[in-house]
Amino acid sequence: MKFHEFGDHHNPHIVLIHGGGNSWWNYLRQARLLSDKYHVILPVLDGHGEEYQHEYVSTEQSAKEFLEYIRKHCNGHVFAIGGVSLGGQIVMELLSLDSHIADKAIIDGSLCIPQPKLAKMSLFFVKCFGKLMFGRAACKMQLKLMRKMYPKMAYPEELERYYLE
């Protein structure tokens, strides 16, 4: 797992975790806006973005990695932690491991009630199509489509250059 950091490390820490099929750049605008007053940490989950070569293991494993990172680099506590979709699942798992790790938590688009059938089906699709859904090629396709479909929401050119090379 890789971490992109914005702002002064002495400011309160905010961790924003992207969803499946996305990467740290999902929160780039927010990080730039918040970095004047906060130390913003944008992780890249294994199997996503530039970490596509590392296999994503599980929500539980990712939460343990975040717990270790926060303990080591943020004195064991952050002001806020947020996640969307898969990122939100990881936030919930992280809070179950240490409910005092953050003052605030923002969870969007994540399942709060276990769905075993959905989990099995999701695992099947990720095993069969994971490289197509979450690899570098998928990132390139998303960036191209974003510019065409939602030009006002397109990512900065430096990100497009990085991923489209």
Name each region found by the language model:
Residues 27-28, 51-57, 116-119:
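Conserved catalytic-core motifs of eukaryotic protein kinase domains, centered on the activation segment
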